[in-house]
Structure formats: C-alpha cells, structure tokens
C-alpha cells in the first residue's frame, strides 16, 4: 500500500507540472510500465502457492455461469468452465495462477454455462483426468468438450455416487447424480472435497428432486463451504438439504443483473435462516477461500455494494 501511495503521489506531481493535455499520455505510460498491475488487476500477477494438506479455492467471476479452481501443493482441479465466451478469461486466469497441469477437470453437467470453455482449458493445459455425468447433450458446446478430451488422448470418465477421487491426497467424494433424470440440472455431479477438518460441497445446478435423492442415499454431505446450486435459483437449495450441509459459508456464482433474477430472495432467505455468511460473484467479483484444514478465510475482488 505504501508503494501504491508513492506512485499516486508521483502521478499527481507529474499531472500538475505538465497540465491537463498530457494526462492521457502519462496515464498510458504508467499503465504500460506495469508498476500498478498488482493494484489494478490482481489476477495479472496472481500465482497460487499452497502447501500440501491445505487448499485454496478460486470461485472465478464468470457472470451467469460457474467456474472454480482448486489448488493444493502445486496440484490443480477445475470444476466447470463458464460460458463459451469466457475462454480467454479463464485460460489467462489459470496461466497467471501458475497452472501447468489440471489434475482433475469436472464438468458438472453439459449445460453451456458450466462447460462452455472447458474445451479451451483442456486444450491449453496438460490434463490428468476429465469427469462428467453419464449423460449427453446435442449441442456444439458439448461436442467441443468431447473433441478436446479426445485430442488429449483421454476419455471422459463418469463417476457414480460412492466413488472417491483423489486430489493431491485430499478425498473428493461423489454424491450425485443418483439416477437418470429428464432435467439435465439434476444430472449434476455433486461432490465434496475434504481438507483436514474442513469440507467444501460443490453442487453444480442440482435441483430439489436431485437434492432429495442424495439425502435418501444417506451420504454425509456436511460442509463448511457450500457452492450454492443453480446460481441461487429457488428451484434448488431446499431447506432439508441446507440443514444437512450445516454450512457456515455459501458462495453463489451469478451474473449481475441477470434475466433470471438470481439469486432469488427466497433462496437468500433460506441460506440466512441457516446462519450462512453469503458471498456473491455479482457483488464481490472473484472470491477466494483458503483453508489450512482447520481455519477458513475469504477474500474477494471487491467489496459488496451497500
């Protein structure tokens, strides 16, 4: 912060000496020099370094879509990949975070706002394994992802409830989808990543029917951090499901001013009724959560609007 104040002081002095005609030139020179990068564009200089046994989760702001990057001990996992037009943003974010290889890639379900740029991420980095539900979609977006996976010499794997994947020694438990559904949202892969005494539950876009089916399986879905399903739609996050998660924090990935009115007031009320502190990408931008296995902390790109 001290360095920031020094640069602002120098900038003000320069503007005072040269007059208003040179404001644009001076600003451009300062910006191009890169000295303000870490203050103006945090993601440009962001590099993730997390010890083994700890984890950092980046809920990347991709508007009305989902994308989360998990990091632990130099290993990375990507859950969903935003919309089609998020490719450059996501790939650049991952590159600047120091990603060379994605050990696990999860497309929770084949809707464009969740797998839109997965093909770009798969093509840009070395890939360990790709997981998607055993359901297809007759869309170019879905076919692009399959082509990207094939281009890496891999096959999409279809996890089932009860499976436990490994992410740098951290268990990734699969809870859903439980069965076949007519609604693609309910085909969402629902998973929990545990780190020591803490846990993170990712729910894709699973809706109430799918949530009840998961509860009926008797899984322990308790978590400290809940990635709220379906951008905060009232058709998800039923009270019983929230009660069983017993989460302290809720993260909603949602676009500002979206046409669906997400997150809906009834969903926010449910989350508040269960005492969850709510973070929203439409208000706070990219949200980062850190855990050492005991403690959890949050930071965000910007402060919430009053």
Language-model region placement:
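Non-globular, low-confidence helical/coil segments that flank catalytic cores
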Residues: 2-306
């Amino acid at each position: 912060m001290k360095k920031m104040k020094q640069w602002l002081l120098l900038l003000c002095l320069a503007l005072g000496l040269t007059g208003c005609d040179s404001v644009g030139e001076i600003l451009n020179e300062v910006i191009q020099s890169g000295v303000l990068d870490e203050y103006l564009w945090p993601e440009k200089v962001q590099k993730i370094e997390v010890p083994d046994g700890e984890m950092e989760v980046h809920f990347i702001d991709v508007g009305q879509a989902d994308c989360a990057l998990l990091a632990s001990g130099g290993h990375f996992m990507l859950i969903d990949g935003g919309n089609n037009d998020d490719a450059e943003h996501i790939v650049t974010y991952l590159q600047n975070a120091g990603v060379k290889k994605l050990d696990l890639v999860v497309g929770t379900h084949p809707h464009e706002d969740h797998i839109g740029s997965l093909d770009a991420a798969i093509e840009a980095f070395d890939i360990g394994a790709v997981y998607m539900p055993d359901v297809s979609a007759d869309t170019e977006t879905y076919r692009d992802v399959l082509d990207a996976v094939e281009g890496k010499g891999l096959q999409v794997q279809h996890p089932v409830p009860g499976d436990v994947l490994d992410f740098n020694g951290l268990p990734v438990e699969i809870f859903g989808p439980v069965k076949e559904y007519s609604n693609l949202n309910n085909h969402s892969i629902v998973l929990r990543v545990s780190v020591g005494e803490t846990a993170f539950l990712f729910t894709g876009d699973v809706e109430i029917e799918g949530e009840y089916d998961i509860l009926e399986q008797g899984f322990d879905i308790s978590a400290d951090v809940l990635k709220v399903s379906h951008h905060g739609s009232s058709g998800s996050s039923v009270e019983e499901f929230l009660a069983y998660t017993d989460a302290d924090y809720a993260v909603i990935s949602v676009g500002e001013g979206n046409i669906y009115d997400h997150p809906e007031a009834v969903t926010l009320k449910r989350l508040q009724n269960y005492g969850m502190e709510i973070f929203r990408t439409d208000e706070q931008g990219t949200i980062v959560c850190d855990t050492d296995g005991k403690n959890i902390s949050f930071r965000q790109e910007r402060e919430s609007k009053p």
